[in-house]
C-alpha cells in the first residue's frame, strides 16, 4: 500500500509545475487534488460471487478555459478478500463542456486493471458520456454535485469481449474563503458488464483534498 501512496503523491507533485504554468496563462483556471478511497469490489461470474475491499489512492488535475474543461485522474491500490487479493490501477481522461454554469457534459475513456498473482491482468476499458450537475448550498463555500455516466463502447481483455457499463457519483465540495484549498466528500458506484453474465461492481467512499492557486 505504501507504493500506491508514493505513486499518488508523486503524481500530485509532478502536476504542480504544470498547474503553475497553466495558471500563469490568465485564460486558464487549474487545480489538482489527492484522493483516498475505501473501495468495495463485487465480482459475479455466473453463480460465482466474490467480494473484496481495500484502499485506493489517486491524484487528479483539472484545467478550465472558458466553457472547456479537461480532467485527468490516476490511482493505485489493493483490494483483498479472506484468501486472495488484487492490485488495482485505474484512471480517466475526460474532456468536458460547460453547457451551463451548473451543468457540465463530458466524454472520454475510463480504465481499470485488476492484477491477480499467477494470472493475466484483467483490463476494463470504457468510453463514456457523462453529465455533472451542481447546486450551491452556501454560495462560494459549499456545493453539492451529482455525476451520472453511461458507457457507449468498451472492452474487457480476459475473457476478451465487448463491455458496457455505467455509474454515478454524488457528494459535497467545500472551498475555504481566501484560501487555496478545497475538499470533497463523495460516494461513487459503477458497474462493468460483459456477455455471459460477468459483472464487476465498484463502490467507493472518497475523500479529496485539493489546491487551486489564488488569483
Locate predicted features:
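Membrane-embedded beta-strand positions in outer-membrane beta-barrel channels/transporters
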Residues: 56-60, 90-94, 128-132, 167-171, ...
Amino acid at each position: 500500500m505504501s507504493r500506491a501512496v508514493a505513486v499518488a503523491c508523486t503524481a500530485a507533485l509532478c502536476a504542480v509545475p504544470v498547474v503553475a504554468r497553466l495558471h500563469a496563462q490568465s485564460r486558464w483556471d487549474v487545480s489538482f487534488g489527492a484522493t483516498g478511497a475505501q473501495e468495495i469490489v463485487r465480482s459475479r461470474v455466473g453463480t460465482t460471487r466474490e467480494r473484496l475491499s481495500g484502499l485506493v489512492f489517486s491524484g487528479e488535475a483539472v484545467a478550465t478555459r472558458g466553457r472547456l474543461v479537461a480532467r485527468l485522474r490516476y490511482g493505485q491500490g489493493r483490494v483483498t478478500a479472506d484468501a486472495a487479493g488484487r492490485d488495482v490501477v485505474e484512471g480517466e481522461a475526460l474532456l468536458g463542456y460547460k453547457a451551463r454554469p451548473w451543468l457540465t457534459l463530458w466524454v472520454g475513456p475510463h480504465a481499470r486493471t485488476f492484477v491477480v498473482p499467477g494470472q493475466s491482468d484483467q483490463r476494463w476499458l470504457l468510453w463514456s458520456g457523462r453529465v455533472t450537475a451542481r447546486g450551491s448550498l452556501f454560495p462560494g463555500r459549499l456545493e453539492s454535485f451529482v455525476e451520472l455516466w453511461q458507457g457507449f463502447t468498451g472492452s474487457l481483455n480476459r475473457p476478451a469481449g465487448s463491455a458496457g457499463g455505467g455509474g454515478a457519483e454524488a457528494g459535497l465540495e467545500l472551498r475555504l474563503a481566501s484560501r487555496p484549498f478545497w475538499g470533497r466528500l463523495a460516494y461513487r458506484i459503477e458497474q462493468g458488464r460483459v456477455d455471459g453474465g460477468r459483472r464487476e461492481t465498484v463502490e467507493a467512499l472518497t475523500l479529496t483534498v485539493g489546491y487551486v492557486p489564488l488569483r
